[in-house]
A protein has these predicted regions:
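An intracellular "coupling" helix at the cytosolic face of ABC transporter transmembrane type-1 domains
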Residues: 13, 104-105, 123-130, 134, ...
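Helix-loop-helix
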Residues: 50-53, 150-167, 234, 238-307, ...
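ABC-type nucleotide-binding domain
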Residues: 321-322, 328-572
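Transmembrane helices of ABC transporter permease
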Residues: 13, 17-30, 61, 65, ...
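Hydrophobic alpha-helical transmembrane bundles that constitute the permease/transmembrane domains
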Residues: 26-37, 66-74, 126-129, 133-145, ...
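Juxtamembrane loop-to-helix connectors within ABC transporter transmembrane domains
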Residues: 2, 11, 43, 80-81, ...
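Short intracellular "coupling" helices and adjacent cytoplasmic loop segments at the cytosolic face
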Residues: 49, 85, 93-125, 196-220, ...
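Membrane-integrated ABC transporters
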Residues: 1-32, 39, 47-59, 68, ...
């Protein structure tokens, strides 16, 4: 199915309004066809016969026709805008919904700004094309068909002469249409590049200022801006060439009409009024053809944008639920990794033959040098990625056999990079459990040592924290994230450097809260600072994607291996 047909499918739910809009459009277009026919009667009947009554009748009729035309124009404009906007809303929501359920791998391979451009620039390009082009197409086609019908009624030979130019127009539109689609695609790509640079620089403004790289970033933006300018001008060049070519072909046709029509009037085969009306219709015929060429160009722009939009909707996610996936019921937290291997691509093995048995309620610390696979191993547990070999079990249930939602509901995560949303402190904590009460939210904040600093703020829990929590300190952001995880009350916890952003006093209080939270829950803790995991039930030491040591703190020190070396290095 081509992209144009796919776009039409989005309009199907609104087909009733669409048909009504087309009806009003056709009636409004008929009003344009009325004037030349009346002009014929004015010349051939009113002026020739000096018929005052007919003149008055025509005058009143013109007013009535244009009054009706105005009502129809309003109705068709409103209805087409409604349908167009609804179609755009549906497409934008479909793209956003698809993005929400794509795997992490999709986002890691693309710039954030490029992904944003799909929802903003590309869907926005469809918006103008769908609303304007659909309305204009029906209007111009109505005028085109109506004009041809009336022209054949006036003089069929002249009408056939008019149609000779049609194949030339169609060929020109086809040739230029292909160029427009190509240049429009490049134009959308350049717009996406600008969005990507803009998103990256705004989100990294503190780094830019700290390195005094404002001029460097301006130069980057100017480069992309001019690349976009060149793409826009290339597209404009093609559009600017198309219209004069169509006009030239139409002008040649009209010239033949005047020449041949004049002979017919001189020979008495056609009245002067009929020739004037015919020429007006022929001119009207040229205008729709010219406008249709412009509409065709806009449609090609829309198809270039649609191609990018549908590329998102057609994207296959790496993480797929089985058709018969079941709900993961309440768990106690036993976790088993059995011969698990993972790699991002064929040549890059990240985890190799991981075997790990964790009892319910145990605290498992994961340590090792950078790049050892510590974060990757815990990312497999909520199925952010799937292993290429082996299986992972929770309470002896293969996590690949259960629904993603029921699996992830059982797991709480405090990531290394704190992510908060623009809104209030209360809403950010509530994100952990949207059904929680105010008392439960406050209890979670107290457990994370966040309640006191929240109450010191002017708006307390309703304090707006800004984008990504920019109005809070690093330690405050971390504690809000921990409170959010506490509120979720999961059976399995993943703590990735969970207290690394806190000051000494807050770290102690939060660590105490986490220690209490982890009681009775299975916890995976990634920590570079070994002082935070000395009491772990099990410490696994990773190197180059493999578990090289495993045991308690005391057991690993006795081995005098990698862990012992890391411990001595930190506590020297």
């Amino acid at each position: 199915m081509n992209n144009y047909k796919r776009l039409l499918l989005y309009a199907k739910p609104y087909s009733g309004r669409l048909m009504l809009a087309f009806l009003f459009t056709s009636v409004a277009a008929a009003g344009n066809l009325f004037v030349p026919w009346i002009l014929k009667d004015v010349i051939d009947k009113v002026l020739m016969n000096k018929d005052i009554f007919l003149l008055n009748t025509i005058a009143v009729t013109i007013v009535i026709v244009f009054f009706i035309r105005g009502i129809c124009f309003y109705a068709q404009t409103y209805l087409m805008s409604y349908v167009g906007q609804k179609v755009i809303i549906d497409i934008r929501e479909a793209v956003y919904r698809k993005l929400q359920f794509l795997s992490l791998g999709y986002f890691e391979k693309r710039q954030t700004g490029t992904i944003m451009s799909y929802v903003t620039n590309d869907v926005g390009a469809l918006q103008g094309s769908i609303i304007e082009s659909a309305t204009d197409f029906v209007t111009e086609m109505s005028i085109l068909i109506g004009s041809l019908a009336l022209m054949f009624n006036l003089h069929w030979k002249l009408s056939l002469l008019t149609l000779i130019t049609m194949p030339l127009v169609a060929k020109a539109m086809d040739l230029f249409g292909k160029k427009l689609k190509r240049t429009s695609g490049i134009m959308q790509d350049r717009a996406a590049d600008i969005t990507a640079v803009l998103q990256e620089t705004i989100s990294s403004v503190r780094v830019i200022k700290s390195f005094v790289r404002e001029e460097y970033e301006i130069a980057r933006f100017v480069k992309e801006n001019y690349a976009n300018f060149r793409a826009q001008m290339k597209n404009a060049q093609v559009m600017a060439t198309l219209t004069p070519v169509i006009e030239l072909i139409a002008a040649i046709g009209v010239t033949f009409l005047i020449w041949y029509g004049g002979f017919e009037v001189i020979n008495g085969n056609l009245t002067a009024g009929a020739l004037i009306a015919f020429l007006v219709y022929a001119t009207n015929l040229a205008n729709p053809i010219k406008r249709l060429s412009r509409i065709y160009g806009n449609i090609q722009k829309a198809m270039a944008a649609a191609e990018r939009v549908f590329s998102v909707l057609d994207e296959k996610t790496d993480i797929v639920e089985k058709e018969n996936a079941t709900e993961l019921k309440a768990v106690i937290g036993k976790v088993d990794f059995k011969a698990v291997t993972f790699k991002y691509n064929e040549n890059e093995v990240i985890l190799k033959d991981i075997n790990l048995a964790v009892k319910a309620g145990q605290m498992v610390a994961i340590v090792g040098p950078s790049g050892a696979g510590k974060t990757t191993i815990v990312n497999l547990l909520p199925r952010f990625y799937d292993p290429v070999a082996g299986n992972i079990y929770i309470d002896d249930v293969n996590i690949a056999d259960v629904t993603l939602a029921s699996l992830r509901e059982k797991i709480g995560i405090v990531p290394q990079e704190t992510v908060l949303f623009n809104g209030s402190i209360y809403d950010n904590i509530l994100y952990g459990d949207l059904t929680a009460t105010t008392e439960e939210v406050m209890a979670a904040a107290k457990a994370a040592n966040a309640h006191d600093f929240i109450m010191q703020m002017a708006d307390q829990y309703q304090t707006q924290i800004g984008e990504r929590g920019s109005k809070l300190s690093g330690g405050q952001r971390q504690r809000i994230a921990i409170a959010r995880a506490i509120l979720k009350n999961p059976r399995i916890l993943i703590l990735d450097e969970a207290t690394s952003a806190l000051d000494t006093e807050s770290e102690k209080l939060v660590q105490d809260a986490l220690d209490k939270l982890m009681v009775g829950r299975t916890s995976f803790v990634i920590a570079h600072r070994l002082s935070t995991i000395l009491q772990a039930d099990m410490i696994i030491v990773m190197e180059k994607g493999q578990i090289v040591e495993q045991g308690s703190h005391e057991e690993l020190l006795k081995l005098d291996g990698l862990y012992s070396g890391l411990y001595k290095l930190q506590f020297k």
